[in-house]
């Protein structure tokens, strides 16, 4: 079945994986907070290096910069590799996502991946980014849970991609969605117990 075929050669696949992983593993949240004199972001809040935890430092601009850079590293990996074909973009995009989640420089303890997920989406299927944003915003308005909004948007995205003809890219995002949900398992437990912080609340 063509959907599951892989034509990119092994050397090229490995090169794309290495390229994507190196880009994705750059811990912008940690770098920016240290440069700003705010210390180690891993020692506050959730201990995460992503934008949500950077926001807990009280520096909104730094959190926004972290969000943007974490997304753009996924975009850069996927878009640049895609110059050699969609499979190259898929390999690099997946590796960038995994690099953010499991950076070798931080003992494989990284972020939860939503920003990089969006970045890879921008690199491989840019027309779907507004759909992701609309789903997230609608869910956030209704539930006021950032984590639940992300879980809903990531769950819908592989289906939307497949329905609009993205094929292999849809399979990539199905895999990334499963990983995203696993990385959010603590959030899911708090949502089920009613202890998850809502948007605008501290915690």
Swiss-Prot record:
It catalyses: an acyl phosphate + sn-glycerol 3-phosphate = a 1-acyl-sn-glycero-3-phosphate + phosphate. Its main location: membrane. The chain crosses the membrane at residues 12-32, 66-86, 88-108, 118-138, 159-179. One of its GO terms (biological process) is phospholipid biosynthetic process. It is found in: Cell inner membrane. It is a multi-pass membrane protein. Pfam families: G3P_acyltransf. GO terms for cellular component: plasma membrane. Keywords: Cell inner membrane, Cell membrane, Lipid biosynthesis, Lipid metabolism, Membrane, Phospholipid biosynthesis, Phospholipid metabolism, Transferase, Transmembrane, Transmembrane helix. One of its GO terms (molecular function) is acyl-phosphate glycerol-3-phosphate acyltransferase activity. InterPro entries: G3P_acylTferase_PlsY. Its EC number is 2.3.1.275. Catalyzes the transfer of an acyl group from acyl-phosphate (acyl-PO(4)) to glycerol-3-phosphate (G3P) to form lysophosphatidic acid (LPA). This enzyme utilizes acyl-phosphate as fatty acyl donor, but not acyl-CoA or acyl-ACP. Belongs to the PlsY family. Probably interacts with PlsX. This is Glycerol-3-phosphate acyltransferase. It comes from Sinorhizobium fredii (strain NBRC 101917 / NGR234).
């Amino acid at each position: 079945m063509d959907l599951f075929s892989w034509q990119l050669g092994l050397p090229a696949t490995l090169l794309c994986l290495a390229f994507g992983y190196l880009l994705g593993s750059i811990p912008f949240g940690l770098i920016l907070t240290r440069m700003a004199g705010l210390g180690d972001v891993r020692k506050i809040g959730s201990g995460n290096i992503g934008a949500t935890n950077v926001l807990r430092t009280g520096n909104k601009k730094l959190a926004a910069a972290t969000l943007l850079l974490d997304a753009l590293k996924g975009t850069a990996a996927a878009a640049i590799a895609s110059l050699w074909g969609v499979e190259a973009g898929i390999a690099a995009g997946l590796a960038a996502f995994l690099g953010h989640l499991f950076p070798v420089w931080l003992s494989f303890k990284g972020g939860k991946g939503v920003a990089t997920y969006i970045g890879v989406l921008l690199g491989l299927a840019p027309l779907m980014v507004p759909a992701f944003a609309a789903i997230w915003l609608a869910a956030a308005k209704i539930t006021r849970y950032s984590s639940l909004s992300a879980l809903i948007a990531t769950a819908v995205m592989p289906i939307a991609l497949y329905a609009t003809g993205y094929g292999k890219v849809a399979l990539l995002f199905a895999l990334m969605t499963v990983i995203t949900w696993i990385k959010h398992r603590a959030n899911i437990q708090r949502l089920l117990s009613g202890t998850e912080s809502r948007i605008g609340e501290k915690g």
